[in-house]
Amino acid sequence: MTRHALRSTAILILAAVATATGTAAAQDRDFAAPPAKPVKLVFIHHSTGEGWLADWGGRLGAALKAKKYFVSDTNYGWGPDGIGDRTDTGHWWLWFRGPKRTTYLNALYKEYEQHCDYTRLAADPGGENTIVMFKSCFPNSHIGGKPNDPPKTGANPLRGQDCGSAYMKVANVKGIYKDLLVYFKSRPDKMFILISSPPLVKGATDAAHAANARAVHNWLVKDWLKGYPHKNVAVFDFYNVLTSNGGNRNKNDVGQTAGNHHRFRNGIIQHIQTVASNYCAYGASGDDSHPTAAGGKKASAEFASLINVWYNAWQASLQKR
């Protein structure tokens, strides 16, 4: 893609976002304010999420503390049946649609502990977790199939499978995420934030699989929630955010106009791509896709700019019910 084409694409994306949200820009500015009192949030993750939360890494824990969110988390080995071990795309069906979902989610909503080290609010405000964040790790960005394959309907062979499954294909991945909306729709009293799977470094994937990952994550942001009736689901494009940097893996491009971003800026939600890359720009090494602290800090800044907008929009929608 040429530089001119990239610039045009970015303008079109911004125009689309502005069209969707521009009439509510003033309202969105109001929605950017922190909650009046602390809100409980639980984050389902593994090693990349741990690094993102950590003070030595992306400092997401500290960023959410500053926004008045009381953060707990799950990690390897957590919960009934050790369900915390299973966080690949196909596993989300087990958590939110499978026969033991009530057991898993009752434990999740009541979780209040830390399962890795990060800064958080000192006082637990009590009650169940209000927000559930969930994220699969970077191997889930190695996706087969074709970029424009539609979501699989009906029985999906990826249900309950790990990311090494032969069924890890675009249609099945999209189908899993569509399946989750059935549960989310049944719980308008909870908020669910999907963190898209982070990108792989170039040495850990190939162009076709990386392009499929880009297509899936664009679909999640633009199409997944079309027609969904509530405001209790959001998606943060962690993948896109980690595909551009400020010159090297230890320097980020947070706050820059150009680059690949998902953030709240100038009164609107921006999801833009001006850098033609489908690979991790912050890999710890040429074959290690764990993001550096610089990448994590960029993601923290951009996510922290969005969460209040999503949360307040959801709360406002509940008042209208």
Residue ranges and their predicted role:
Residues 1-10:
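Bacterial N-terminal signal peptides that target proteins for export
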Residues 49-167:
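Conserved SGNH/GDSL esterase-like catalytic core that processes O-acyl groups on lipids
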Residues 37-40, 67-72, 127-132, 186-193, ...:
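Loop/turn elements at helix/coil->beta-strand transitions in domains of secreted/extracellular proteins
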Residues 9-20:
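Bacterial N-terminal signal peptides
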Residues 44-47, 74-80, 134-139, 195-200, ...:
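Active-site-proximal beta-strand/loop segments in catalytic clefts of secreted hydrolases
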Residues 27-71, 308-321:
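N-terminal module-boundary/linker segments of secreted carbohydrate-active enzymes
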Residues 199-250, 255-258:
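Substrate-gating cap/lid alpha-helix
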Residues 260-321:
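Histidine-centered active-site loop/cap adjacent to the catalytic His
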